[in-house]
Amino acid sequence: MATFDDVKAVVVEQLSIDADAVKMESKIIEDLGADSLDVVELIMALEEKFEIEIPDSDAEKLIKIEDVVNYIDNLKK
């Protein structure tokens, strides 16, 4: 769950939302209220935090927080 906690912290900071709103099943746009610019900034912040690169083709598949956590965990293997 360490990855989730780190992702959650980035999401809370980038979207200026309450931490309680961020759950594994939360959809970034529909549930957390992100717009397309928010998503771009969120991806950039995640890349910086985790020292990874997320190609646009992968970024568009990251719909839920769970998708982001699993993606990052798979890169770290």
Curated annotation (Swiss-Prot):
GO terms for cellular component: cytosol; membrane. One of its GO terms (biological process) is lipid A biosynthetic process. Its main location: cytoplasm. It comes from the Bacteria. PROSITE patterns: CARRIER, PHOSPHOPANTETHEINE. Residues 1-76 form the Carrier domain. 4'-phosphopantetheine is transferred from CoA to a specific serine of apo-ACP by AcpS. This modification is essential for activity because fatty acids are bound in thioester linkage to the sulfhydryl of the prosthetic group. Belongs to the acyl carrier protein (ACP) family. This is Acyl carrier protein.
